[in-house]
């Protein structure tokens, strides 16, 4: 018998299907879990504004719950709007990250309150972030000089064939100053050193007076590995990358297009036996 109190859910490739929708069965499972007193945390690399509409669709602004955005860079209480955790990049790294992307001839973007900010606003891979977050693309001529405010992360977007080589080069250049890691075939996250979903969830659990044994985490991407390994019950989607499956306690038989999250919630939270 599992005593899950907190349910952390990655969004893209996990909670939502490939059309970025939450299916009726999954929605019903989440509603039932919330009714049992489980706190739902939407845990994503997306910016906060790119998660807010889904949180409201699920009723977390009224029922309670949290948004964990920027891969753990920020946690917001859905009901009160209070920022519980926030970690930002060293401002000196912003121009260096922009120069790194320019040298690789690839796009890099970040966010403001209105949307996604990028020099290469027509870039195919950068525009995938618009589709994912439902946020508009804002073109600027010089991203490094435009960003005069704290940012929780920057996102490098590129052809999947180049991802691993570029990521390795970035990890070498920014070692000890920022963490770079892939979050999808065409995205590389650049976040403050040590920021990851597991650390921010640990901080949230401490605030709630809970232990990691009460946490269930579901995900599919490499940026989900830390929280899946950390959670009392770590769940990988059937469509997850193999390293994610390797660190999970359970791999769903269904993928994100066939209610994989519902399968896990029904098995570990709703089942009475």
Segment roles from a protein language model:
Residues 37-41, 63-65, 153, 213-214, ...:
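Short active-site oxyanion
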Residues 57-61, 85-86, 125-129, 197-198, ...:
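Short, hinge-like loop/turn segments at secondary-structure boundaries
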Residues 2-6, 23, 189-273:
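Mg2+-dependent phosphoryl-transfer enzymes with acidic/Ser/Thr/Gly-rich catalytic loops
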Residues 26, 51-55, 166, 170, ...:
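Hydrophobic packing residues within well-ordered alpha-helices of enzyme cores
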Residues 58, 63, 71, 174-176, ...:
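Short, structured coil segments at secondary-structure junctions
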Residues 100, 104-218, 222-226, 230:
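Conserved acidic, metal-coordinating active-site core of Asp-based
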Residues 3-19:
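Asp-based phosphoryl-transfer active-site loop
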Residues 24-125:
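Active-site phosphate-binding/coordination module
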């Amino acid at each position: 018998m599992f005593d899950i109190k907190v349910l952390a859910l990655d969004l893209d490739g996990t909670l939502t299907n490939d059309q970025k929708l939450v299916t009726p069965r999954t929605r019903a499972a989440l509603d039932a879990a919330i009714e049992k007193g489980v706190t739902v945390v939407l845990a994503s690399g997306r910016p906060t504004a790119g998660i807010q509409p889904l949180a409201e669709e699920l009723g977390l602004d009224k029922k309670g719950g949290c948004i964990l955005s920027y891969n753990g860079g920020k946690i917001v209480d859905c009901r009160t709007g209070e920022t519980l955790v926030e970690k930002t990049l060293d401002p000196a790294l912003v121009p260096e990250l922009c120069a790194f992307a320019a040298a690789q001839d690839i796009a890099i973007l970040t966010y403001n309150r209105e949307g996604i900010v990028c020099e290469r606003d027509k870039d195919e891979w950068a525009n995938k972030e618009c589709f994912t977050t439902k946020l508009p693309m804002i073109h600027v001529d010089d991203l490094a000089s435009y960003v005069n405010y704290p940012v929780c992360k920057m996102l490098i977007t590129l052809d999947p064939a180049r991802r691993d080589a570029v990521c390795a080069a970035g990890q070498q250049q920014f070692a000890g100053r920022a963490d770079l890691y892939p979050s999808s075939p065409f995205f590389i996250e650049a976040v403050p050193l040590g920021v990851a979903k597991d650390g921010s969830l640990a901080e949230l659990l401490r605030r709630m007076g809970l232990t990691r044994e009460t946490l269930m985490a579901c995900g599919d991407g490499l940026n989900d590995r830390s929280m899946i390994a950390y959670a009392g019950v770590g769940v990988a989607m059937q469509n997850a990358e193999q390293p994610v499956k390797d660190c999970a306690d359970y791999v769903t038989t269904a993928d994100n297009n066939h209610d994989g999250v519902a399968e896990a919630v029904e098995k570990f939270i709703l089942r009475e036996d």
